[in-house]
A protein has these predicted regions:
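Non-cytosolic membrane-interface motifs at loop->transmembrane helix junctions
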Residues: 86, 145-156
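Bulky hydrophobic segments
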Residues: 6-137, 141-142, 166-225
Length: 225
């Protein structure tokens, strides 16, 4: 579930800034690791296209954003909350369902666009499901509510994103899209490794970077509220 706290008096989502600050805190170490990763690939004679490299940096920024928006950027406090009844909350609160679909829609576009191995609806479905499941498991540790409806809507968002990708394939030539794509067996594992490393960074290093860069500023803003 996307973590948003609304201030009725000011009529704004203050924590959009809060989320963005966590995105920046998490993206800085990810960016350094990606630079090292592509340097190592080049040293071994494996040179991805410039389009793939640039889009991978954008994709990693998106992944950090997903984790920040779902609360996987805060200090752990084990207090599990569960919502295991499917579809009921979707009917009661369709806004959350729509936001969850939108949140994972880019994933269904990025995966086949970046990795040849994910030019498959079944693989996008599986990875969308696993990515969402990992978030729901982590949310057991005080980062939000573990909700089966989030799992359903996130996975549907990834599948819908794959449909958008197929539409793009019809609009643009394959040669243009292939400029962003990497091939080979390792392309099957790269997004999984990137997602895992991003989670680990968001739960560890990111917290310290956030405290250094933004904690004092945000605590002052909270006191004003």
């Amino acid at each position: 579930m996307i973590q948003l706290v609304y201030n009725k008096q000011k009529g704004i989502f203050m924590d959009l800034e809060f989320i963005f600050n966590h995105v920046i805190s998490g993206y800085l170490p990810i960016m350094v690791l990606l630079i090292l990763y592509f340097i190592i690939l080049k040293s071994f004679g494996n040179r991805p296209s410039k389009g793939h490299i640039i889009l991978t940096f954008i994709f990693s920024f998106y992944l950090v954003g997903v984790l920040s928006a779902t609360g996987v950027c805060l200090k752990a406090n084990f207090s599990p909350r569960f919502s295991l009844l499917p579809f009921i909350d979707m009917i009661r609160g369709p806004k959350d369902a729509v936001l969850n679909v939108i949140l994972f829609l880019p994933l269904g576009i990025f995966l086949p666009l970046l990795y040849e191995q994910y030019n498959s609806l079944s693989k996008v479905f599986l990875l969308g499901f696993l990515f969402s499941l990992s978030i729901e498991i982590i949310q057991m540790f005080g980062f939000g509510t573990t909700d089966i409806n989030d799992l359903i809507t996130n996975t549907f968002g990834a599948v819908l994103g794959y449909g958008v990708y197929e539409l793009l394939r019809r609009l643009f030539s394959d040669s243009l899209l292939e400029k962003f794509q990497t091939k080979g067996k390792y392309s099957l594992y790269e997004p999984v490794i990137l997602w895992t490393i991003t989670i680990l960074i968001m739960l560890t290093i990111q917290l310290y970077i956030y405290d250094i860069l933004f904690a004092s500023k945000m605590s002052g803003e909270i006191q004003k509220w």
